[in-house]
């Protein structure tokens, strides 16, 4: 089945979407500096429910018009404002291992990035188009895929995206209206 946005339209291959939580208490997905990072290299969920986050380009290497559940995907932030020091950082998402919070979703150049891809899977069969993000390692059978969930930083409450054994982050997709930016 095609992955549908919050208006019921299939996601376009290469389209730009806000990735929003199904729980309105939190905002969308964006990049932020965590730990001792000087640039926003960590993919996080905004704690401001009015913040839709950064538009994310969702693309599949397959020559298809629309994204279907289970397609291998690349996720990449559309351009966003950063301080001069951080201009030019690659914005494609990757999963980096050996971090205190576990395998975490990052952007930028990461020599510890795991070879793999993301995919989108539906979480419920109701009228709400609720999905989860999944990360699969390159050699993956299905059991080598992990749901993308949230790890909450005990120091400052930052909500980092991580490959999780616990509850997946349930999301919806909202098409970025380029005209309104």
Swiss-Prot record:
Which residues form each disulfide bond in the chain?
39-86, 136-145
What PROSITE patterns has UniProt attached to this entry? SOYBEAN_KUNITZ
The record, for Pfam families, names: Kunitz_legume
One GO MF annotation is: serine-type endopeptidase inhibitor activity
| Annotated site location: Reactive bond for trypsin | 63-64
Q: Which residues cross the membrane?
A: none
Keyword annotations of the record? Disulfide bond, Protease inhibitor, Serine protease inhibitor
Which CDD domains would you find in this protein's record?
A: beta-trefoil_STI_SKTI
Note, other: Electrophoresis identifies three genetically distinct variants, A, B, and C, that are inherited as codominant alleles.
Which PANTHER family does the UniProt record give?
A: KUNITZ TRYPSIN INHIBITOR 2, TRYPSIN INHIBITOR A
Q: What does this protein do?
A: Inhibition of trypsin.
Question: Of which family is this protein a member?
Answer: Belongs to the protease inhibitor I3 (leguminous Kunitz-type inhibitor) family.
Protein name per its UniProtKB record:
Trypsin inhibitor B
